[in-house]
């Protein structure tokens, strides 16, 4: 699926530098779940290396940046950032990451991704720019993509936090294996998200180090770059907090399971002791010697009731002295 959009730049806020000089609009080409031939064709049309398009199919491709000039001398920036996906794509209660491939020129941005209708991409397509976020160049639009991807990570971490709380509550009251299996899924998500967010932050730093050499408007840095960095730092902090919670949850789960098993063993021990009384009584009256009540027509009933009464007395004694609590 191909999505095409022409974005008009904000002329009042436009800074004058080598990136935005006299450029009034941007063409954005967005490809979702494209086939390899489609990716190859569009890259060849702009005289770009076709291997750039191969990375979109590598689920484990990490975030990085590269600069390239084509035969016409046009500068293109090739960027990969990692976005999260979860219940929209997979059935597990966890998150994975996938690469968003960005090819940026002066008046052109091309993006490629393997998934369709991702919430953060729908926001980008609606051009829901944050307040005081001037859209002045292709670089600004790419920064907006970084912003939305950071927001997607924050949303994913928020959902993961709820899953962690749910697993914690289940671990308090269960010794079943499904709690451990749920915790395994919960463990996977923050690992993927943590790696992706840290890689994205490094790529953001590298791209800004290069383009800030061309940028003279300090207001732009305050309005755009700082907004993106704040969102990225928030995502990093939230993920680190969740990683710490999961580590504690792992320890807590081990302790809770151990305590629950101890409680089960205590109950079984009490039952065993109580059941020992009628067992011993039946053993004594089963001997082939003269025994009390052997000639009494109600002897069996008397012995049975006596055993039950004795078992109840033993139970209350154990309960009274808190022997197994």
List each model region and its residues.
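Non-transmembrane, interaction-prone segments in cytosolic or luminal domains
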Residues: 49, 71-72, 137-141, 282
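Hydrophobic alpha-helical transmembrane segments and their immediately adjacent juxtamembrane loops
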Residues: 230-325
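Helix-boundary and N-terminal cytosolic regulatory elements
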Residues: 1-132, 203-217, 318-325
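Extended amphipathic alpha-helical scaffolding segments in membrane-proximal extra-membrane regions
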Residues: 84-87, 94-256
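Short alpha-helix boundary/capping motifs
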Residues: 69-72, 188, 192-195, 211, ...
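A short, structure-level motif marking secondary-structure boundaries and short turns
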Residues: 23-25, 141, 178-179, 299-300
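Proline-rich low-complexity regions
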Residues: 34, 63-66, 84, 155, ...
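Residue-level signal for alpha-helical context at structural boundaries
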Residues: 57-61, 171, 178, 185, ...
């Amino acid at each position: 699926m191909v999505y095409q959009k022409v974005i008009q730049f904000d002329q009042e806020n436009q800074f004058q530098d080598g990136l935005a000089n006299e450029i009034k609009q941007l063409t954005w080409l967005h490809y979702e779940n494209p086939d390899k031939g489609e990716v190859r064709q569009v890259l060849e049309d702009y005289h770009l290396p076709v291997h750039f398009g191969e990375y979109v199919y590598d689920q484990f491709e990490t975030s990085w940046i590269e600069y390239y000039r084509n035969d016409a001398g046009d500068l293109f920036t090739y960027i990969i950032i990692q976005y999260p996906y979860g219940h929209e794509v997979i059935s597990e209660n966890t998150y994975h990451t996938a690469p968003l491939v960005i090819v940026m020129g002066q008046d052109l941005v091309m993006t490629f991704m393997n998934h369709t209708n991702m919430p953060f991409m729908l926001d980008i397509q609606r051009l829901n720019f944050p307040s005081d976020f001037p859209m002045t160049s292709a670089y600004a639009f790419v920064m907006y993509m970084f912003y939305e991807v950071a927001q997607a990570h924050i949303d994913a971490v928020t959902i993961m936090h709820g899953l962690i709380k749910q697993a914690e509550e289940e671990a308090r009251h269960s010794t079943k294996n499904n709690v451990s299996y749920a915790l395994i899924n919960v463990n996977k998500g923050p690992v993927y998200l943590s790696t992706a967010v840290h890689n994205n932050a490094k790529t953001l730093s590298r791209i800004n180090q290069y383009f800030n050499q061309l940028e003279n408007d300090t207001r732009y840095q305050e309005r755009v770059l700082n907004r993106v960095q704040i969102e990225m730092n928030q995502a990093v902090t939230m993920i680190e907090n969740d990683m710490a919670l999961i580590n504690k949850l792992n320890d807590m789960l081990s302790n809770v399971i151990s305590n629950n098993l101890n409680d089960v063993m205590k109950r079984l021990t009490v039952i065993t002791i109580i059941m020992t009384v009628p067992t011993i009584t039946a053993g004594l009256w089963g001997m082939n010697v003269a025994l009390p009540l052997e000639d009494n027509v109600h002897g069996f009933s008397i012995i049975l009731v006596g055993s039950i009464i004795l078992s109840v007395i033993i139970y209350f004694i154990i309960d009274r002295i808190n022997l197994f609590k």
